[in-house]
A protein has these predicted regions:
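N-terminal presequence-like segments and the immediate start of the first folded domain
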Residues: 1-70, 74-88, 93-142
Length: 142
């Protein structure tokens, strides 16, 4: 088997990692912060020029969750799978008091409660650039 790097148009930040790797029928998705292309571009530019990291923009938490989950879906789809084939998800929230809002949106990305993956959710001491959350996942290709 050969490791395959999955590209799906999800904004990359020039960090020393791939966002998604497929190995055989397994999919590994790195922690995804809610970075849209505009912010990711500013981050790449700052890193390339050795400048300070730009502050994370003031984006409503609901929008941050949708950015992360949309990017996860894009990566899963590009790997030849679907959200219902995720096996394990790890969620870091900046503020645990936002768990209900997160859960409401998160559930909408799966076809039923039976297809929800195993999951760990915790409050992070600090998230990337102080954004509201980061989510990583492991899944399979049916």
């Amino acid at each position: 088997m050969k490791k395959q790097v999955i590209k799906a148009g999800v904004p990359e930040t020039s960090g020393p990692f791939n966002l998604c790797v497929r190995y055989g029928d397994m999919i590994y998705i790195s922690g995804l912060p809610p970075f849209d292309e505009e912010y990711a571009s500013k981050l790449r530019d700052a890193r390339a020029k050795g400048q300070p990291i730009p502050p994370f923009p003031d984006i409503p938490f609901e929008r941050q969750v949708r950015i992360v989950m949309d990017h996860m879906k894009m990566l899963v789809d590009a790997a030849g799978s679907n959200m219902d084939c995720l096996l394990k998800v790890i969620v870091w929230l900046k503020d645990q008091r936002q768990q209900e809002e997160f859960d409401r949106i998160y559930r909408s990305y799966f076809s039923s409660t039976e297809t929800l993956p195993a999951r760990t959710r915790m409050q992070a001491g600090r998230t990337p650039m102080d954004c509201g959350l980061e989510v990583e996942a492991i899944g399979y290709v049916p």
